[in-house]
């Protein structure tokens, strides 16, 4: 089976293709679609078999919960047991948008969708294509990122086709996504809201809105018997095919160390990949150097991260060295993804 690829934009929707995509989802099939964060792999969230198909297509462990996407505020109440007041405040401020909330689930949501948990992760995306597809599918679409599990998340339809083109029925090509990192996930099943995955909406923004919000300290669960409460917590994610390491420290020391590593590799007849910035890219004479953007524009760094990791897969490099990107607002989200991609391999200088 080869996926049908249909192209459209938010300003020029192909409603006939969206209707067909909705029918595929209603019948238990899978459709990949754009959101403002990354491309999602959609299945009917209320159909246990569809959720299991998502896990199979991605090669994803079935205890890794799926996010249920809605496109209307009144679709939230039927799938949750309750909505805490603080969750209502966040929904009013950030929905539709890159925010996922974990809430106690209702009996309407099958355990297959929630990874066996009694809670459900819910998001209302702002992308118009996503919204119309969700409505056409009946209102509830479970959708993790549309990539093979463990690989960098897809920011273009081409990325989806590379990973899942033979495993799903349809890919809706809406162009390159806007943000490029997955949504912020906030858990409301505890007394104090807890950020389980950082994203575009930062911890500081959440604290300004709600007051006491905490960052989960164990974003990767060490115990394989512990069920992750949110996508991305337990398993290695976002990884390129080459080994990736992050070089941390003062800029001068980082540049010097990466150049030493590149020279050493060259002496052995190998070329390394280097993830640099606009400010440092010309300081690396050896290696395949890619700039992720300027440190002055953190949204650009976030936007290009997965694209850069995937681009290295088209090269012959076996090792990649990246600078660290502790930027003011999105630094937590960027470094969360980069550290997971590197398997937490850090070289301190």
Residue ranges, per PLM feature:
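Active-site-adjacent structural elements in enzyme catalytic cores
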Residues: 1-349
């Amino acid at each position: 089976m080869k996926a049908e690829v249909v192209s459209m934009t938010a300003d020029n929707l192909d409603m006939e293709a969206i209707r067909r995509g909705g029918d595929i989802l209603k019948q238990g099939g899978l459709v990949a679609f754009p959101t403002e964060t990354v491309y999602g792999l959609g299945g009917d969230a209320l159909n246990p078999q569809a959720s299991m198909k998502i896990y199979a297509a991605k090669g994803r462990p079935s205890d890794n919960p799926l996010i249920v996407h809605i496109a209307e505020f009144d679709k939230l109440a039927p799938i949750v047991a309750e909505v805490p007041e603080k969750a209502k405040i966040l929904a009013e401020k950030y929905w539709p948008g890159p925010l996922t909330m974990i809430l106690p689930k209702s009996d309407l949501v099958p355990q297959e969708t929630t990874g066996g948990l009694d809670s459900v992760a819910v998001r209302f995306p702002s992308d118009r294509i996503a919204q119309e597809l969700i409505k056409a599918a009946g209102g509830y679409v479970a959708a993790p990122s549309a990539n093979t599990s463990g690989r960098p998340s897809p920011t273009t339809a081409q990325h989806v086709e590379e990973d899942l083109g033979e495993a799903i029925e349809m890919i809706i090509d809406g162009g390159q996504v806007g943000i490029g990192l997955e949504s912020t996930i906030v858990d409301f099943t505890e007394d104090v809201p807890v950020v389980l995955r950082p994203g575009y909406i930062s911890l500081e923004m959440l604290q300004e809105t709600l007051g006491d919000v905490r960052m989960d300290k164990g974003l990767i669960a060490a115990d394989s018997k512990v069920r992750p409460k949110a996508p991305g917590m337990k398993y290695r994610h976002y990884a390129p095919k080459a080994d990736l390491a992050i070089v941390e420290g003062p800029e001068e020391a980082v540049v010097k160390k990466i150049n030493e590593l590149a020279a050493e590799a060259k002496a052995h007849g190998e070329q390394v990949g280097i993830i640099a910035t606009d400010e440092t890219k010309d300081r690396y004479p050896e290696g395949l150097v890619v700039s992720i953007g300027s440190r002055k524009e953190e949204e650009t760094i976030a936007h290009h991260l997965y694209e850069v990791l995937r681009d290295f897969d088209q090269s012959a490099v076996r090792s990649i060295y990246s600078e660290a990107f502790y930027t003011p607002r999105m630094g937590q989200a960027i470094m969360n993804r980069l550290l997971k991609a590197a398997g937490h391999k850090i070289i301190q200088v």
